[in-house]
Amino acid sequence: MLNRLESLTQRVGGSNELIDQWLHARKELLVSYCTVIGIKPQKEKHTPLNAKTLENFCHNLVDYLSSGHFHIYDRIIKEVEGASSPKMALTAKIHPALKNNTQTIMAFHDRYTNIEIDDDSCTEYQQALSDIGEALDARFKLEDQLIQWAAESWQAAQLADADKKSQVN
């Protein structure tokens, strides 16, 4: 996921401040995920794992999901094409998938926020971390479609503006 993020950042980074902020937030989320999946159970029963690391991941997770749903998705659509966009079919397909994905991810958040992970629950927790990794990967693929669409639209608009300016001169 980090490699795909790096590749996407190289392709579209710098094309729009909103996209750059979104990609930066994704990187922070991925770093916290990588940190949390490295957590191992302690030797003593009922000794919690690094709760701060899990708390940080859950916090980043909610922040990332919230900014996408309540800020970024709508702004991208409005800035790029407007409400009457012919590409609204793309967003009409992606948005429900993102909504379902959010429910999956929030179920993890609700289950593992403020809980102690001990040896008895460690296997379940490790499986949940694997599942959340798959859910994040699926989400990022959907979001990448929006990002690519936005980058292409902004580039086309810049080319059209450049053509207009060259025709005036």
Curated annotation (Swiss-Prot):
Transmembrane segments: none annotated. Keywords: Cytoplasm, Transcription, Transcription regulation. Belongs to the Rsd/AlgQ family. The gene is rsd. Binds RpoD and negatively regulates RpoD-mediated transcription activation by preventing the interaction between the primary sigma factor RpoD with the catalytic core of the RNA polymerase and with promoter DNA. May be involved in replacement of the RNA polymerase sigma subunit from RpoD to RpoS during the transition from exponential growth to the stationary phase. It comes from Yersinia pseudotuberculosis serotype O:1b (strain IP 31758). It comes from the Bacteria. The lineage of its organism: Bacteria, Pseudomonadati, Pseudomonadota, Gammaproteobacteria, Enterobacterales. Its main location: cytoplasm. One of its GO terms (cellular component) is cytoplasm. GO terms for biological process: regulation of DNA-templated transcription. HAMAP family: Rsd. Interacts with RpoD. The keyword Transcription regulation applies. This is Regulator of sigma D.
